[in-house]
Amino acid sequence: MEGGGDGTTAREHAEVLLGLGFVAAQAYVLGAWTDVNRIRQSSARAPVTKSDCYASDTITVQAGITRIHVINATANYFKHHDEWRTWPQNETARILATIDITQKTEFPCIDATELLCGTGWRLIVLHRIVKEWREHLIHSLQ
């Protein structure tokens, strides 16, 4: 590799870029949740929780865990893992554990990307996932 890099160095750099991709997908998901609740409010319907929205994805990766749960948890991991002195006992860690991402996982964002997008790390797949989910969300929960 140019500059004396090795495979580990390349994966370290990819981990950051993929983590940013998950944060961007999370922002899209949060925007969809806000949109559906605005639509519901305009027709005097009760708001929907984020948890219910994430669970509405039609594709699960494990029992009760959807692709949207994984996107959200991976984004939260990426944003906050440097603050963690120890691995947390929270919803993010619980969801990641269901897809075998733990404190021992060297590259969590890479592992999550491979699960959702394949080994080619094509982040456009994340966009497709959240776009299709948003369309389903608007039609099913508005």
Question: Which residues does each predicted region cover?
Answer:
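Acidic, Ser/Thr/Gly/Pro-rich intrinsically disordered interaction regions
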Residues: 1-19, 48-142
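Short, well-structured hydrophobic secondary-structure segments
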Residues: 10-40
